[in-house]
Swiss-Prot record:
Keywords: 4Fe-4S, Iron, Iron-sulfur, Membrane, Metal-binding, NAD, NADP, Plastoquinone, Quinone, Thylakoid, Translocase, Transport. [4Fe-4S] cluster binds at residues 60-61, 125, 156. GO terms for biological process: aerobic respiration; electron transport coupled proton transport; photosynthesis, light reaction. It catalyses: a plastoquinone + NADH + (n+1) H(+)(in) = a plastoquinol + NAD(+) + n H(+)(out); a plastoquinone + NADPH + (n+1) H(+)(in) = a plastoquinol + NADP(+) + n H(+)(out). This is NAD(P)H-quinone oxidoreductase subunit K. GO terms for cellular component: plasma membrane-derived thylakoid membrane; respiratory chain complex I. NDH-1 can be composed of about 15 different subunits; different subcomplexes with different compositions have been identified which probably have different functions. It is a peripheral membrane protein. Residues 220-241 are annotated as: Disordered. NDH-1 shuttles electrons from an unknown electron donor, via FMN and iron-sulfur (Fe-S) centers, to quinones in the respiratory and/or the photosynthetic chain. The immediate electron acceptor for the enzyme in this species is believed to be plastoquinone. Couples the redox reaction to proton translocation, and thus conserves the redox energy in a proton gradient. Cyanobacterial NDH-1 also plays a role in inorganic carbon-concentration. The keyword rRNA processing does not apply. It is found in: Cellular thylakoid membrane.
């Protein structure tokens, strides 16, 4: 080291060698040290990256959604955690045909989900009934006749990339919501399901059906004889001869 350098110059050389960026200086500006936000933005920011879907797949559209679980698409990066119980889910993905007999079960699952909750109608069969509604009287022609739908995803079936696009659009909707205006969209009434209570009723098996004409035993004289059998006496006489 050059002995002609002053101690101050030597100190500056050492600081520049050990820490080229220099010592960080804390600014006194308020905007550089405090994050200002609203309660709506903070609440929505926490929810839009933690959507927990309930997968309600009934037909071939669900196969495309199952492809998202693999490593090629990896839907976990969006914070999607599939749930098997509606009480821990806030997103209902309906994929496939919904029949009249299945409609009360779907509505009951939707009612068991806590607020706020969202619904994605995936596929043509879910949105309009699809090809199964052409000749069938039991297919529901649009799941929005049963439950409110937040996002429609057309296709037969939709590609996994389209499902990603639907999730991104739903995240934008969640990010623009307001806590004060949420009561306008909350569910205030039940849909087509009734109270699931067990009531004691009288037995319907009273035996009256046995008195019907169709339940009576047909006599042997009224039965149609297919083959005329010979009498037993005739058989014995032929054996003796």
């Amino acid at each position: 080291m050059n002995p002609q350098l002053s101690p101050k110059a030597i100190r500056e050389i050492r600081e520049g060698t050990c820490n080229p960026l220099g010592a960080p200086q804390v600014t006194t500006d308020l905007s550089e040290n405090i994050i200002l936000t609203s309660l709506d933005d903070l609440h929505n920011w926490a929810r839009l990256s933690s959507l927990w879907p309930l997968l309600y797949g009934t037909a071939c559209c669900f196969i495309e959604f199952a492809a998202l679980i693999g490593s090629r698409f990896d839907f976990d990066r969006f914070g999607l955690v599939p749930r098997s119980s509606p009480r821990q889910a806030d997103l209902l993905i309906v994929a496939g045909t919904v029949t009249m007999k299945m409609a009360p079960a779907l509505v009951r699952l939707y009612e068991q989900m806590p607020e706020p909750k969202y619904v994605i109608a995936m596929g043509a069969c879910t949105i309009t009934g699809g090809m199964f509604s052409a000749d069938s009287t039991t297919a529901v022609r649009g799941v929005d006749k049963l439950i409110p739908v937040d996002l429609y995803l057309p296709g037969c079936p939709p590609r996994p990339e389209a499902i990603f696009d639907a999730v991104i659009k739903l995240r934008k909707k969640v990010g623009n919501e307001s806590i004060l205006e949420r009561k306008k969209t909350e569910q205030t009434h039940r849909y087509i399901t009734s109270d699931h209570e067990m009531n004691l009723v009288f037995s319907e098996n009273t035996g009256e059906y046995l008195n019907k004409t169709s339940a009576k035993v047909i006599s042997s004289s009224q039965k149609e004889k297919i083959t005329e059998l010979p009498e037993k006496t005739e058989i014995t006489n032929t054996e003796k001869d």
